[in-house]
């Protein structure tokens, strides 16, 4: 009885699929407060009964200042033949996200794709460039607070081109070259 009580804290929020998601970094030019970058394709699921309410999202190992302007979840459109958000600009609402910040989908077996898609809107201060290796996602399931991460990196440049020298400098800070 004691072993069962100490064996875990209940369901958790985690990236969907079988094993950790592939690490990638997206480059996005012309990012500003007036035209935030949108990042999607991040499928999350709950490992047991319950719903996870996302309470905050922060960049992991950022270079420069990144502001998370908005975030929301929706049922994974890939499950019904639709397209995930990917990398865009504009608002999450324009791409079918509501103000929902709850993950209700239970994790499936293997690489089922079961889960809810997380979309994030981010910006950088005027005239600056920034980058991150991924996102720390804080959440609550009932009274249990925890965090998980998703390794979708982003290079966010206020310059009009990813090939502009200040933007290339951010890539180099992550050991990458265009």
Predicted segments, located by residue:
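Non-catalytic macromolecular-recognition regions in eukaryotic signaling proteins
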Residues: 6-178
